[in-house]
């Protein structure tokens, strides 16, 4: 590896290359979800397990917020908490995800309890929260850059699920509409911070490694779902069991 610092354009190209290879829109479970190949119970398993990820994002963001050294940075990052937790009960991304889970036929209290999630889901999400808590601020912010690729997966997911699943409506998928504007805003902040603070090639490599780690977090959640609910279909003890189709 050369010690030469990458230009902003070169760094973005390297980040995009990671997404093109590793982002979870490429996972077989997501391909099946978007192509209408899953039964309702499998869609429920996805919504249930994804809730744990959604519910821990505000905790992850609050952990980083406490570490940011300036008021300007804290104000910018605080908007993520508002996006996910909302400013009142029933608002924000977590509440909208609960609405999605109810829309595909799950009981709200059961989803909120997280009692039925897969161990692999819990381990992956908790590892992400710990990463943001324990690694450098630069790496923590860089790990959020999977949002660079989220508009593509949102478009695929919304169009595919509406086309293939009669139990899914536009209202069910309301979570995704605000993300189309929130995610680019968050990406702009993260890239600006990285351009200013990743001043050496070694720091830039840390940025790239953080994005790879986050892609692994997302991919491993889908590995767990695929193993439990698709092939070979071995659901761990205590995890959600769909009703027979």
Residue ranges of each PLM-predicted region?
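Non-heme di-metal
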Residues: 2-245
């Amino acid at each position: 590896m050369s010690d030469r610092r990458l230009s902003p354009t070169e760094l973005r190209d390297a980040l995009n290359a990671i997404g093109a290879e590793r982002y979870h829109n490429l996972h077989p479970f997501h391909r099946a979800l978007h192509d209408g190949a899953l039964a309702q119970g499998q869609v429920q398993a996805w919504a249930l397990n994804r809730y744990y990820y959604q519910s821990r994002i505000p905790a992850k963001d609050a952990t980083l917020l406490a570490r940011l050294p300036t008021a300007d940075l804290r104000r910018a990052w605080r908007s993520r908490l508002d996006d996910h937790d909302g400013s009142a009960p029933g608002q924000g991304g977590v509440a909208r995800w609960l609405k999605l889970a109810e829309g595909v036929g799950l009981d709200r209290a059961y989803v909120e309890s997280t009692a039925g999630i897969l161990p692999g889901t819990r381990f992956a999400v908790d590892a992400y929260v710990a990463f943001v808590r324990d690694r450098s601020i630069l790496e923590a912010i860089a790990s959020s850059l999977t949002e660079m690729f989220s508009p593509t997966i949102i478009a695929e997911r919304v169009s595919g699920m509406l086309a293939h699943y009669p139990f899914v409506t536009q209202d069910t998928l309301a979570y995704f509409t605000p993300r189309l504007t929130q995610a680019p805003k968050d990406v702009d902040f993260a890239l600006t911070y990285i351009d200013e603070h990743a001043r050496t090639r070694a720091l830039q490599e840390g940025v790239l490694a953080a994005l790879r780690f986050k892609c692994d977090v997302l991919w491993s959640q889908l590995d767990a779902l695929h193993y439990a609910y698709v092939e070979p279909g071995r659901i761990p003890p205590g995890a959600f069991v769909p009703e027979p189709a």
